[in-house]
UniProtKB/Swiss-Prot annotation:
Transmembrane segments: none
Single GO molecular function: rRNA binding
Subunit structure: Part of the 30S ribosomal subunit.
CDD domains linked: Ribosomal_uS17
Family matches, as InterPro entries: NA-bd_OB-fold, Ribosomal_uS17, Ribosomal_uS17_bact/chlr
Family indicated by similarity: Belongs to the universal ribosomal protein uS17 family.
GO cellular component: cytosolic small ribosomal subunit
Keywords: Ribonucleoprotein, Ribosomal protein, RNA-binding, rRNA-binding
Function: One of the primary rRNA binding proteins, it binds specifically to the 5'-end of 16S ribosomal RNA.
HAMAP family xref list: Ribosomal_uS17_B
Protein name: Small ribosomal subunit protein uS17
Species assigned in the record: Methylocella silvestris (strain DSM 15510 / CIP 108128 / LMG 27833 / NCIMB 13906 / BL2)
Domain of life: Bacteria
GO BP of this protein: translation
Length: 81
């Protein structure tokens, strides 16, 4: 099964080697037929501390690294390609 890749915005970089990424998804509400936005925060591993608040990043699913961390940040060159 392929690993999931999501794109989002960094909302926190205060932890050591960890960033919090807000990922937004859009879907059509089944009853109201209106586009709804929902967001979720993911803790991702950032080994180099290269990303700051407001940066757009791609994260990839990986094995659990801690209680909350199950994602790693993709390098900028790989994220765009």
């Amino acid at each position: 099964m392929p690993k999931r890749i999501l794109q989002g915005v960094v909302v926190s970089d205060k932890q050591e080697k960890t960033i919090v990424v807000k990922v937004e998804r859009r879907f059509t509400h089944p009853l109201l037929k209106k586009t709804v936005r929902r967001s979720k925060n993911y803790h991702a591993h950032d080994e180099t501390k290269a990303f700051k608040i407001g940066d757009t990043v791609s994260i990839e699913e990986t094995k659990p690294m801690s209680k909350l961390k199950r994602w790693i940040v993709l390098p900028a060159a790989q994220a765009q390609g």
